[in-house]
Amino acid sequence: MKVLMFGWEYPPHVYGGLATANFGIAEGLHAQPDMDITLCLPKPWGDEDRTFAKIIGMNCVPIAYRDVNYDYVKDRISHIMEPELYYKFRDHIYADFNYMNVNDLGCMEFAGGYPSNLHEEINNYSIIAGVVARSMDFDIIHAHDWLTFPAGIHAKQVSGKPLCIHVHATDFDRSRGKVNPTVYSIEKNGMDNADCIMCVSELTRQTVINQYHQDPRKCFTVHNAVYPLRQELQDIPRPDHTGKEKVVTFLGRITMQKGPEYFVEAANMVLHRTRNVRFCMAGSGDMMDQ
């Protein structure tokens, strides 16, 4: 099976959990027999692990025709993807995008990460997805989180292939129920157009069903996996805490989605029973001052 996957970040350039999850599912799919994954990223840097997926830099896909020679293209993009792909994509430009802000290769630039003009970059990404979908041979589309849902929808419209969206979180989770209408609209549009909705937890699945009004029959809970601890790490001797203060750490975003209030409640319960435990929180988020 050939998978056209749309992602927003990928190790080693990690801005959040999405990069790790994207890498993990690419690795897991690659381990299955007869799987071929093409992963589209806004701005790959060239040092990404390509063991499990062929990476396409959306900033190297032309949307406006430019007559450039092979050596120049090779010099510009060969650290990201094969120059031959540039010309393949150029042959599938589907509209006149010369009015867009493109570079000398006819490609759009991306800042990488989550810039202030994020919604503009999401739209640009979806435009480029139309070129990619017209050029590639694939069986299914996999779109990671709301940032890539418009791209996934465009690829489905172009190809007629089924769209599977991967909901790593919803705006209800990220905003404690105070949703951004624009983000909600993008999320719901992606869900409405999806043939399959993968949710990272049953809670997320119920949110998708109840808050986004989706058919439960196309919503599936697919939990994130964990890597077994390497043997050399298991063999490290554990320190002796006998008679010493024990330390329990919360490390992550201090936001509702990560449950920091449960950590505080647990600390309160434990400290009412024993005094040799110290609870430490490290991170930032909208619940920081509570």
Show the residue positions of the predicted features.
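Membrane-proximal helix-turn-helix segments that form the acceptor-binding/catalytic region
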Residues: 130-135, 157, 180-197
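Nucleotide-sugar donor phosphate/pyrophosphate-binding loop at the beta->alpha transition
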Residues: 118-128, 161-164, 172-189, 228, ...
